Every structure is written in C-alpha cells, then in structure tokens.
Amino acid sequence: LGDVYKRQLLYVGKNTNRKLALFGIKTIGDLARADEEVLNSHLGKMGSILWSFANGYDDSPVKLENTHAPIKSVGNSTTTPKDLVCDEDVKIVLYILAESVAARLRENGFQCRVVEISVRDNELFSFTRQKKIDHATNITGEIAAYAYQIFKENYNWSKPIRSVGVRGADLVTDNYWEQIDLFSSVEKREKQMKMDSAVDEIRRRFGFYSIQRGLMYRDRILSAVNAKEEHTVHPHGYFSG
C-alpha cells in the first residue's frame, strides 16, 4: 500500500489531504514515514490516528462478520479556509457543521441529548465544551443554537480561531419518548422537523447547494464548505479507547 495515493486512506478528506500535501506527503508510504509528532502538531489527535493507520496499527478488537458497532455520537469539524475573527464568522461555521450533524442523526434514526463543541485557535490551543440539553433533538436549528450558546459562554476572543467542531452525543432513537413540559412549543418543533426533512429531500435530489440558509450569504468563503458530503461518521470501536 506504500505507493497508494493517501486520499484512499480512511479519514483523509479534502482539507486533510491539502494539509498533508504542504509537507510533501502524497502516498500512504509517505504518511507512514512521517514524524508522528509533526503530524500531531498540525492535525491534532487525528495526526496520530492517520499515522497509525498508514503503518497498519489498529488495536481495536476484532469483530465477527456482520457485527455493527453502536453509534455513540455523530460529530463533524473543519479547519476553516480563513481565520475566524468574530462571532458572526463562528455562527456561520457552526450552522454549517450543525446541518451536517443533524442530517446524519436523521439519516441514522437518532436524536442527541448532549451538544458538544470543539475550538482550536490560530496558535493550536484547543478545548471542548458540552451541554446537556432539555429535549433530545435532531433539529438543525436547535443543535446550531445550542452550539453557538456554548461558544458564547466559553470564548473571549483572545485569539482568532482556526478550527471548529460540533458533536451530538448521548444518542437515543427517534422513537424515544420523553415528557414535554407545558411551556414547550410542540407545534413549532414539529414544523422545524418537517422543514428539515424537506431540506434533506431537496438536497438529495438537487445537490447540497440547491438550498441554503440566508446566513450563508454573508460570507461566501466560509459558507463554501459542504460539511455533510465531507463528513465521516467515526466507528465507535476505534475511538472509544
């Protein structure tokens, strides 16, 4: 596999492929011979994961054929095409990521009860924060709103931001029943669910960019990312250790 193009390796998406190319890494063999610490400094934890895969290392337990690992969470992150310097920038990217996470949850028949964000600044300092939410959800607007709330409560803009992630965790199935308080707008949530389903269908038939939120037109560079198509649902078995 040493001469195989690196993009064929699991988890090497468009952005990661571009970063590796900056270091002259073109094949899986190049990646296997790279310095793991250098990869970590530029890709975070994913640097070690890619280095391990390129070298054939995988200590996850062997499973029988047709065994499916349970999905424990659905998340997505992106290194932005330019540094984020204000709340508006972050809001756009969080909505893009929330769209991909919510769509994956709906596709797999799940809702999340925890929303988590990750943030990395332009000096590569990173942190994660999460929030237990009132009602399980796979509604795009709700996940985005919670993610933005978490960000506002935890970042003071000491430095510009280079990378952002959103994750839905503590998953339950779509048929999960929970008591709704008297002040919750059930009709409003049902309308949002129908709207999300309609958007999913339009994008399935005509492509991701066939329908966009008005927010995305405020910055065409940041909104150019198709997070859902570049999204990989990570197998729980490898990352649970």
Annotate each PLM feature.
Residues 1-5:
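Short, small-residue-biased leader/transition segments that mark boundaries at the very start
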Residues 17-23, 51-52, 211-217, 222:
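Short hydrophobic alpha-helical segments that form membrane-spanning helices or hydrophobic packing faces
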Residues 18-161:
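DNA-contacting surface of Y-family translesion DNA polymerases
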Residues 136-241:
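Acidic, metal-coordinating catalytic segment for phosphate/diphosphate chemistry
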